[in-house]
Structure formats: structure tokens, C-alpha cells
Amino acid sequence: MPRIHVLPPGLVNQIAAGEVVERPASIVKELVENALDAGATSVGVDVEEGGLALVRVADDGSGMDRDDALLALERHATSKLRDAEGLAAIGTMGFRGEAVPAIASVSRFRLDTSAGEDGAGTRVEIEGGVLGEVAPVARPRGTTVEVRDLFFNTPARRKFMRAASTEAGHVSEAVIRLALARPDVGFTLRSGGRLVLGARAGGGLADRAGQALGREAHRHLLPVDARRGEVRVHGLICSPDHSEATGRALYLFVNGRYVRDRAAAHAVLRAFAGTLPPGRHPAGVLFVELPLHRVDVNVHPQKLEVRFAEGREVFDALFHTVAGALRTAPWLRARPQPGDGVPVGDGGGPAPVPVAGEEAAEVLAWARAARPPEGSGATLVQPAPGAWATGRLAFPVVPAPGAGPEAGPRPEGYFAGLRYVGQHARTYLLCEAPGGTLVVIDQHASHERMLFHRLREAFRARRIPVQPFLLPQVVTLPPAAARALEAGLAELGRLGFDAEPFGGEAFAVKGAPAALAGVDLTALLTDLGSQLAEVERGSAVDDAFHDLLATMACHAAVRANQDVSPEEARALLDGLDAIDFKARCPHGRPVVFELSLADLERRVGRR
């Protein structure tokens, strides 16, 4: 039986390097973080062959004297941590004291550093973990680290490296993350002598975000800043007009440290629910700040993951901050302002909470409903004869007593300020905005968004008005949808349906949400049955009900190639101003398109 023995220090460092030094980008991250912890105001990074031949990081930080320079190359030697209490509240980027010796053990390593203003410094050279020359060197205050021939003494690790261009891309991404975290610090990155990134100190987060996300994304950035309890979320997020195919363009930082956290990213994605097309992801740069003792950063070899004491609190803060920004953003809505009947949060925008049951019932009175909840104060709107069969619009004009359809004040919002011109192709509403801008509104997408909003608010308040049928309507569904619907009758009831099995694949529907007057119940319940199969317990339930409500709104909304009267168009425009989000339908398609008078005149040669 083999005897247990203690590994030699060089091998220990190489094993540690396997965790800390995954690729050249890992070296860049560790060395730049050390520079930032040293108070650097300027950091320069140079790489050759993607960092495999050379990584050089130079900074103007505090530097080190000779003794500290040598001690920094010992394992678990650090200036950033002294006791267990400090480990529970880490505020620096590094703290373990293992990265530098691990890097030096798998490369030809040189450290030049100076802590004084007299130009006297120290040079330390190490090859494969073996200490070489230690000599004085003339240099200004700060530190320069050169790492050459990475993994020269561990060929098994070297062969797993990607092409130089791929590794250079990872280095660039690492520097971008660090530059986003510290807009107050200047950064340069050169690869093969070519300047890849130049970010001046103090340029602001918007400039850094533009460099990271691209010029097109920069045009769509919205500021976010809110606090919930002890958690503050701030930064920049792209409006739904710009999205990405993957989630890589969403940069999340916790107490200044870039992290990968699926729950946090999902919170942001949830905030965008119903605003992005399927398969698209939001982009932005978000910072989460909370007390140091409430987050554990010592859970990942490269400190890319963290553990929160109260993860739900962070999730809620991210969700409500981003969702609130989308509701209050200027591009999204000009009104209503505080006092217009919309719940107002601390920041002056709509509060990110469900509306009360009375308010939900009141807005749902737009639908051709028969019975709003008692005490709601909602206007009773009886369904027109044959409404369930004709499929007419579910937003009838309800004028004040004795007034015509144009009487009475309208919401003082963007859509209320439009002059309705007419309908194009029986699908688009054409309007004129002040200043001559042509506004084209997709009648189905806009009506779908309005119905979805009202269904969602009523669902949150558990007050969806139900239209009971005089006689049950029997619908027959495909076998798979019928099985899912029968298993999900409880969820169906929460959505406002009163249905029960009627033998085989048939169901007797005794009532349905009043907002869905005129829909094809068979088609709707078939779609809902398919989606109900995806409803699970836990966090997935809210996502699933979002999709169910979106399907209900889609079926109830006016269709393309359907006539809309001027009164109905006006009612739709006024209704859009009363909801918190109207730029996209629940499935992420745009609702509105604008063409300025200047653009129009350029297109016809008048300018």
C-alpha cells in the first residue's frame, strides 16, 4: 500500500495553479486585481500570442519594498487579510495570497516594483517556481509583472490551450470586466503591439459600457438606481430595443467584483418578461451593493461566484429595480406622472408592486364584462349581443352619461397626444404626433399588450372578473391538451375559467374571464392546455403564468385584417397611456414605429 507523504512546495504550487491559472486571461485578472487593490489609477496590460508568450501588467499603485516583494511570492502571504473576522467581510479583490506564487510556478516570472518616490526598486525573477535573481532596479513607484512562456514546464497543461486568437479574446473580456468595475481607473490593453482597449480614467460608466457593449447598444442604455432594504442596485441596462442572442452581454458585479450568478441573471431576465422576443437576452452593466458580511466571496477558486446570506433579497432588488426602470424610462412612457392614478414609488416612478384589487377591477371594466367584484367601483359594461361569437374588440367606448364618444378628458400621455389619421391594411393604426412625426401602431400587438397588463394586474390581485355563461359551452380538445388541462384545473381557475371534465377530451366551460369576450374557446384552451403542462412548483410558476396570460391576451386582442372604428382606435390609444409598459407586446414584438417629418421629407427628396 502506498505511504502518505507531503508534496514538495513546487508541486503544491503547480496544483494550485491548476485552479487559479486556467488560461492567460486568469493571470491578467489576478494581476490587475492586485494592481487595483494597491490603489492604482492607471493599469496597462500587454500580451503576446494571446498571453501564452507574454503577459505584462504595469500599474502606478503603492508598490512594494524588497522584503514585501519576496514575501509576496510565498504561498498564503497577503496584506489584505489577518484573521477569520476579516474573511467574513472581504472588501478587496484578492485575499488568499496564492495567485502570484501559483503563476510563478508555471512560467518565467519577473517582478519589478518600487514603493518609494526615490526611483529605487526591486527586481525578482523566478523560473518554474525556482527563485532566481533578486536585484535593485530603477523605476517609478508602482509594479510591473511579466509572465513569459506560460506552462513551459507543464506541457500537459499547455496542449489544452486554445488558439492564440481565442486566448486573446478571453484576455480582452477579462480586461473589459475589470474596466467596467472601475471607471475611475485608466486601462489600456495591447495585443501583439496593437491597441485593443483604451479607457481613460474618470470617463464614466456610460463610456465604459459603450466600449464593452458596442456603439449600437450604447444608444439604448438606461440608468437604473434603487435600494431595497440593505441592497442597492445601480448601473445601466439596455432598453428592449436592443437585445443579444446570449446572456454574455449582461455584466453583473457584487460589491465591485464581477460574478456569474444564474439567479441574479434570471432576475434581470424576469424583469424583461414580455418585452423581448423569444431567445433574446438583455444587455447592460449592473452593480449590486450590500454589506460585506452578507456575501461570501470565498466559494470559487477564481472568485467568479459568490453566496448570498439572503439570495431572495438580492433577486427581488434586481427584479424590481430593472422592472421599475423599464416602466419609467422616457422612451417607454411620457405619462402618467405622479397623481395620475398610477402607484408611485419612492423614486417618483410607478411602484413595482401589484395594483390593488379595486384598481385591477376598474381597469378591467374596459372589457365587455358583466360582473366586476363587489365594492370595486368599476363601471358595469354589458357584453353586446352575440359578442362571444362575433369576436369584436374587447375595448368598447364607454362615454360619460350624456356625452359623445369624443367628450371628456383623456390621459395626458404620449398616445393621448396623437391625432388618429386612419387604419392601414386593416392592421396598422396611423397617427400624427406633435411636430409631424408619423406614428404607426400595430393594432394587434398594442391591444394584446393592454389586455395582458390588465389581466396580469387582476391576476396578481386575485380579482379576475368572470363572465358566467347562461349555458355551459362544451369544447373538445386534442388528447394531450385535454390531459394537461384536466391536471391543471386549479391553475385554470386562478386564470378566471370555470371548467370541468365532460367525458373523454371534452370540457364544460361555465365561465371565462370577462376580458376574453369573443374568443374561440377551443383554440384558446388548446393552447392553454399545452402551456399548463409546463407549470411547475417553485420559481417557474410565475414565468409559466406570464406565458398563460400572454396567450389569453393574444387570443382576445383584435386581429390583423380586422376593421377598427375611429372610436375604438381612440379608446385603444387612451388605454395604452394608462398602463405601465406599452413598447412591446407580451411576446416581445414592437408595438410602435415612428417616422419623423424630417426623415419622411428626406425620403421624398424635400430635404
Swiss-Prot record:
Cited HAMAP family: DNA_mis_repair
Q: Which NCBIfam families match?
A: mutl (TIGR00585)
Q: List, alphabetically, the GO terms of the cellular component aspect.
A: mismatch repair complex
Name the gene that codes for it: mutL
Q: Which domain of life is it from?
A: Bacteria
InterPro entries recorded:
DNA_mismatch_repair_MutL (IPR020667), DNA_mismatch_S5_2-like (IPR013507), HATPase_C_sf (IPR036890), MutL/Mlh/PMS (IPR002099), MutL/Mlh/Pms-like (IPR038973), MutL_C (IPR014790), MutL_C_dimsub (IPR042120), MutL_C_regsub (IPR042121)
Q: Which UniProt keywords apply?
A: DNA damage, DNA repair
A Pfam family of the record is: DNA_mis_repair
> What is the official name of this protein in its record?
DNA mismatch repair protein MutL
| General function of this protein | This protein is involved in the repair of mismatches in DNA. It is required for dam-dependent methyl-directed DNA mismatch repair. May act as a 'molecular matchmaker', a protein that promotes the formation of a stable complex between two or more DNA-binding proteins in an ATP-dependent manner without itself being part of a final effector complex.
Q: A single GO molecular function, which one?
A: mismatched DNA binding
Record the organism.
Answer: Anaeromyxobacter sp. (strain K)
One GO BP annotation is:
mismatch repair
SUPFAM superfamilies named in the record:
ATPase domain of HSP90 chaperone/DNA topoisomerase II/histidine kinase, DNA mismatch repair protein MutL, Ribosomal protein S5 domain 2-like
Q: Which family does it belong to?
A: Belongs to the DNA mismatch repair MutL/HexB family.
